[in-house]
Amino acid sequence: MKKVMTKEGVELRVEDSIIYTTDSKAFWRSGNMLIGNGKAMSYTCRSMDEAVDIVAALYGGKA
């Protein structure tokens, strides 16, 4: 399990292909798609590291 802190103080917790946030949201990667907030956020997400960067950007980026 990997943890990443964002500039807005929200912690991202990565477990397998799912990213959980401390503000009770979840994002997941399926193939090249990153899904969260009820919609596809990216159709070209190539790795979990890239997925974490995209989600962290929603919270001001990595701290």
State where each predicted segment sits:
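Short amphipathic alpha-helical segments that mediate assembly, nucleic-acid/protein binding
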Residues: E11-L12, A26, M48-V52
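Short aromatic-glycine-(Arg/Gly/Cys) micro-motifs in beta-strand/loop hairpins
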Residues: V14-A40
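Serine/threonine-rich, low-complexity intrinsically disordered segments
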Residues: E8, Y20-S24, R46, A56
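Mixed-charge, Lys/Arg-enriched low-complexity segments
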Residues: V4, L34-A63
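Negatively charged, low-complexity tracts enriched in Asp/Glu with abundant Ser/Thr
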Residues: M1-Y20
